[in-house]
Amino acid sequence: MASRFPKFSQGLAQDPTTRRIWFGIATAHHFESHDDITEERLYHKIFASHFGQLAIIFLWTSGNLFHVAWQGNFEAWVRDPLHVRPIAHAIWDPHFGQPAIEAFTRGGAPGPVNIAYSGVYQWWYTIGLRTNEDLYAGALFLLFLSVIFLIAGRLHLQPKWRPSVSWFKNAESRLNHHLSGLFGVSSLAWTGHLVHVAIPESRGVHVRWDNFLDVLPHPEGLEPLFTGQWNLYAQNPDSSSHLFGTSQGAGTAILTFLGGFHPQTQSLWLTDMAHHHLAIALVFSIAGHMYRTNFGIGHSMEDILEAHVPPGGLLGRGHKGLYNTINNSLHFQLGLALASLGVITSLVAQHMYSLPPYAFIAQDFTTQAALYTHHQYIAGFIMTGAFAHGAIFLIRDYNPEQNKDNVLARMLEQKEAIISHLSWVSLLLGFHTLGLYVHNDVMLAFGTPEKQILIEPIFAQWIQSAHGKTLYGFDILLSSTSGPSFDAGKSIWLPGWLNAINDNNNSLFSTIGPGDFLVHHAIALGLHTTTLILVKGALDARGSRLMPDKKDFGYSFPCDGPGRGGTCDISAWDAFYLAVFWMLNTIGWVTFYWHWKHITLWQGNVAQFNESSTYLMGWSRDYLWLNSSQLINGYNPFGMNSLSVWAWMFLFGHLVWATGFMFLISWRGYWQELIETLAWAHERTPLANLVRWRDKPVALSIVQARLVGLAHFSVGYIFTYAAFLIASTSGKFG
């Protein structure tokens, strides 16, 4: 007899209902719950899956390069980056006849194509790629890497090549290799690529494998490095009249500290970025030699943590016990990694538009909007995941004996104070912000806009001024034109920085007013409420006043029966589930704010944002309704146009989003009743009843249905806004 799915759980494989299928899929990667799992096998499976993950990433990036080289217009775009629309790939089968073919034949392509809003053209152009051959070479190399990683993953599952558990728990070696090897060496390699390939290419010098040993990246060669005259590498930078990709106005510097942006490309100076990566390489290479491994020198992580008892006794036993707690809990490690990665991803979103690193990307408005929104949503999911795994750690891996009176134990002891503080902050922010918005709405409705409560964000303006923004007239630090720091700034360090801050056409230190003040506090409300739900879920995961034995029920449980009353919706999983709605809501406000602020900046009518963003009807009417007109006109009685696909995606996104409520509102009793009726009808319908199944159909569990509902809500929500964002931006700016 063939073994039934799932092989990893014999108990589940013998389940006579459809629960076997759905629960089998849901727990396929939940290695901890599998029948034959040991600690060693768990580490090996995770290790192998990392190789698989890397293989998929390289295959995906290889596919991007390959399709652009094959079906794109990279070489035409390189000749005129500001006017040629970059093509992502061809559309094989354009439905809806001739109008569709005409609508989607763009960018000089022979047939229907998709336009790229990912910024890959600008990225590849900046790093020195110029021809389709370059793209094909990159695609082949990444494909090769992908295969190597797949083989490596398979290899490390073989008995001879399996690392031991002690290898996985060797924190010092891992830190050293990640700091020096991953960050240090890769940053150094990237500096090398920028200096040897990208910077020469930006000056019209073509460096490839056939000539890279003959072309000096700097006229002085390595002499300044060995004689200590490093300042020579910063002399003679590109001039403000430099035409990117040509020798006109080009300099010879390779490592500079200019600040600001290249006037033509509106992106950071390549020579500044090379300098930055070299500095990062140096710092991380040194950092990767700090921890004690083979030679008995350097720091021991455990010694540091054990010794770190804060003075005054206010934090108890400090970090005692933390080393073994973290090192033996994969969920704790994953929680820390996700928290870090989430913050970094959000920082990427903030920095990619304010300090654009890629040539001409700042003038590709739809790409700017798409990249910001994309990275913020990803950051949101990663950050909520951090708290989810933190809660799982507290339920499954936390040992109170091992952590007596250390900072972790004290967090749990003080959880009521933490949770109640987050609660009052959320209430204060929510009621005050909504109160101000609604007051302003009422004043507008009664025709007395002058009675609005408009608060200038003077503290934020003061901070902007201290960094050099002169508009507000604060005359402080770098905005004081007569001050010594201002004078030094022009000559000694970052001469282009102050110019960039005071250029009102970019997104660096955007001018802010009462509308920004209000939406800032609305976003703060969302952030604090999301944090409240997540922190409460994690801190109460082991037990609460209402349910002291909660940890015995695991991470996700629907209720503990009717007898105890009030135990529904209080598992740590439920907190994560609720927090995701708040996270999406918050990022909605963040992206609305970013997008509206920027489309008015790009269109040259910032007054619209400034005047309409101080009341809710302004947001609904002048942002959402006004900018959805492109979607509403995606197709009309006269046929379709190039925005039609976004109009359909907008509708489809709403459909997926609304489907989520079907799972969220009606619970399993309703579905079980419906299933029984449908099964009865099926068995009595000719022809249909020729199809039989072995598993008895049962409804999803409450927790499963919530997950399915949440997934539809999230996907639909993001699809809807993505279509709105891309259509409204590309409809205005092409």
From Swiss-Prot:
Subcellular locations according to the entry: Plastid, Chloroplast thylakoid membrane
Top-level EC class: oxidoreductase
Topology relative to the membrane: Multi-pass membrane protein
Positions of [4Fe-4S] cluster binding: C559, C568
Residues annotated as transmembrane: 46-69, 135-158, 175-199, 273-291, 330-353, 369-395, 417-439, 517-535, 575-596, 643-665, 707-727
Residues given in the record as phylloquinone binding sites: W671
Annotated chlorophyll a B1 binding sites: H654
Ligand binding (chlorophyll a B3): M662, Y670
Annotated GO biological process: photosynthesis
Gene Ontology molecular functions: 4 iron, 4 sulfur cluster binding; chlorophyll binding; electron transfer activity; magnesium ion binding; oxidoreductase activity
EC nos: 1.97.1.12
InterPro entries named in the record: PSI_PsaA/B (IPR001280), PSI_PsaA/B_CS (IPR020586), PSI_PsaA/B_sf (IPR036408), PSI_PsaB (IPR006244)
Cofactor note: P700 is a chlorophyll a/chlorophyll a' dimer, A0 is one or more chlorophyll a, A1 is one or both phylloquinones and FX is a shared 4Fe-4S iron-sulfur center.
Keywords assigned by UniProt, alphabetized: 4Fe-4S, Chlorophyll, Chloroplast, Chromophore, Electron transport, Iron, Iron-sulfur, Magnesium, Membrane, Metal-binding, Oxidoreductase, Photosynthesis, Photosystem I, Plastid, Thylakoid, Transmembrane, Transmembrane helix, Transport
GO CC list: chloroplast thylakoid membrane; photosystem I
Reactions catalysed according to its record: reduced [plastocyanin] + hnu + oxidized [2Fe-2S]-[ferredoxin] = oxidized [plastocyanin] + reduced [2Fe-2S]-[ferredoxin]
Keyword tRNA processing listed: no
Main location: plastid
HAMAP family according to UniProt: PSI_PsaB
Quaternary structure, from the entry: The PsaA/B heterodimer binds the P700 chlorophyll special pair and subsequent electron acceptors. PSI consists of a core antenna complex that captures photons, and an electron transfer chain that converts photonic excitation into a charge separation. The eukaryotic PSI reaction center is composed of at least 11 subunits.
Family of this protein: Belongs to the PsaA/PsaB family.
Function of the molecule: PsaA and PsaB bind P700, the primary electron donor of photosystem I (PSI), as well as the electron acceptors A0, A1 and FX. PSI is a plastocyanin-ferredoxin oxidoreductase, converting photonic excitation into a charge separation, which transfers an electron from the donor P700 chlorophyll pair to the spectroscopically characterized acceptors A0, A1, FX, FA and FB in turn. Oxidized P700 is reduced on the lumenal side of the thylakoid membrane by plastocyanin.
Protein name: Photosystem I P700 chlorophyll a apoprotein A2
